[in-house]
Regions:
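Short hydrophobic/aromatic helix or loop-helix immediately within or flanking a transmembrane segment
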Residues: 46-99
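Transmembrane alpha-helical core positions of polytopic small-molecule transporters
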Residues: 17, 84, 114-115
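Membrane-interfacial loop-to-transmembrane-helix junctions in polytopic alpha-helical membrane proteins
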Residues: 5, 102-105
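Alpha-helical transmembrane segments of multi-pass integral membrane proteins
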Residues: 12, 79-80, 106-111
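Start-transfer (signal-anchor) and selected internal transmembrane alpha helices
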Residues: 1-37
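Juxtamembrane/transmembrane-helix boundary motifs at the membrane-water interface
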Residues: 24-43, 66-76, 97, 102
Length: 129
């Protein structure tokens, strides 16, 4: 019974991930050049947009030594400290072990962790769903 449930969760998760891969691949052809991707981004370039760019920065360079403060307003600017360290540290370790870059290491790691989270949530909530 439990194994069948995990397979069902895996099936739904795989469909959702396949949809997002197809969607990112399609929209990459329409993505305007930005500093994170440059012109003509591929799938892996698209995975480091949005929050992925912050995780990449942390994995490659670490956290900044101090919070960046806007000189005019005195407010804290956007920075890497808004993101938890577990994912970028795991990515950094895999980058070191494999010699591969963050987009190639981070994307499969996020998929694996997402699957583990989907199974855990499914097992925790299956009596309520």
């Amino acid at each position: 019974m439990r194994r069948t449930f995990v397979y069902r969760v895996l099936g739904v998760w795989e469909l959702a991930r396949a949809f997002s891969v197809v969607l990112l691949t399609i929209v990459s052809h329409y993505q305007a050049p930005v500093s994170w991707t440059g012109p003509h981004p591929d799938y892996f370039s698209m995975t480091v947009l949005w929050d992925g760019s912050w995780y990449r920065l942390i994995a490659e360079q670490g956290y900044p030594p101090a919070l960046p403060i806007d000189a005019v307003t005195g407010t804290v600017q956007q920075n890497a400290w808004a993101f938890y360290p577990a994912f970028p540290e795991m990515s950094r370790l895999l980058m070191w072990v494999t010699g591969l870059g963050f987009p190639v290491v981070g994307s499969p790691l996020a998929l694996l962790l997402g699957f583990a989270a989907a199974v855990a949530m499914g097992l925790l909530l299956r009596d309520r769903v």
